[in-house]
Amino acid sequence: MNFALILMTNTLLALLLMIITFWLPQLNSYMEKTNPYECGFDPVSPARIPFSMKFFLVAITFLLFDLEIALLLPLPWALQTTNLPLMVMSSLLLIIILTLSLAYEWLQKGLDWTE
């Protein structure tokens, strides 16, 4: 009962906040508001320097692999089983999935910096 009440309250609060943001008036963005500000001086270099998409893809790949390894480390405690073959097989399955996804990224040149 408490979980359902908390879930319903959080859902209603999130919906209320979303509705309020859509009802609020959109502020006009003047040219002065969109320009970068450097202590009262004109900016020396452009404020929005584009970065390489390869860097973004490598960062996302790192986050995914880091998350999967974070799931792999507590696996023996999470399963809490006396069935050792089941734990070993599930760990090996996760490692095989990690290896196959790394090989796929490598073959698709997702980790290649030169182009």
Curated annotation (Swiss-Prot):
<keyword id="KW-0830">Ubiquinone</keyword>
<keyword id="KW-0496">Mitochondrion</keyword>
<dbReference type="GO" id="GO:0006120">
    <property type="term" value="P:mitochondrial electron transport, NADH to ubiquinone"/>
</dbReference>
<keyword id="KW-0249">Electron transport</keyword>
<keyword id="KW-0999">Mitochondrion inner membrane</keyword>
<comment type="subunit">
    <text>Core subunit of respiratory chain NADH dehydrogenase (Complex I) which is composed of 45 different subunits. Interacts with TMEM186. Interacts with TMEM242.</text>
</comment>
<keyword id="KW-1133">Transmembrane helix</keyword>
<feature type="transmembrane region" description="Helical">
    <location>
        <begin position="3"/>
        <end position="23"/>
    </location>
</feature>
<keyword id="KW-0472">Membrane</keyword>
<dbReference type="Pfam" id="PF00507">
    <property type="entry name" value="Oxidored_q4"/>
</dbReference>
<keyword id="KW-0813">Transport</keyword>
<keyword id="KW-0679">Respiratory chain</keyword>
<keyword id="KW-1278">Translocase</keyword>
<comment type="function">
    <text>Core subunit of the mitochondrial membrane respiratory chain NADH dehydrogenase (Complex I) which catalyzes electron transfer from NADH through the respiratory chain, using ubiquinone as an electron acceptor. Essential for the catalytic activity of complex I.</text>
</comment>
<comment type="similarity">
    <text>Belongs to the complex I subunit 3 family.</text>
</comment>
<dbReference type="InterPro" id="IPR000440">
    <property type="entry name" value="NADH_UbQ/plastoQ_OxRdtase_su3"/>
</dbReference>
<keyword id="KW-0520">NAD</keyword>
<feature type="transmembrane region" description="Helical">
    <location>
        <begin position="84"/>
        <end position="104"/>
    </location>
</feature>
<dbReference type="GO" id="GO:0008137">
    <property type="term" value="F:NADH dehydrogenase (ubiquinone) activity"/>
</dbReference>
<dbReference type="GO" id="GO:0005743">
    <property type="term" value="C:mitochondrial inner membrane"/>
</dbReference>
<dbReference type="GO" id="GO:0045271">
    <property type="term" value="C:respiratory chain complex I"/>
</dbReference>
<feature type="transmembrane region" description="Helical">
    <location>
        <begin position="55"/>
        <end position="75"/>
    </location>
</feature>
<protein>
    <recommendedName>
        <fullName>NADH-ubiquinone oxidoreductase chain 3</fullName>
        <ecNumber>7.1.1.2</ecNumber>
    </recommendedName>
</protein>
<keyword id="KW-0812">Transmembrane</keyword>
<dbReference type="InterPro" id="IPR038430">
    <property type="entry name" value="NDAH_ubi_oxred_su3_sf"/>
</dbReference>
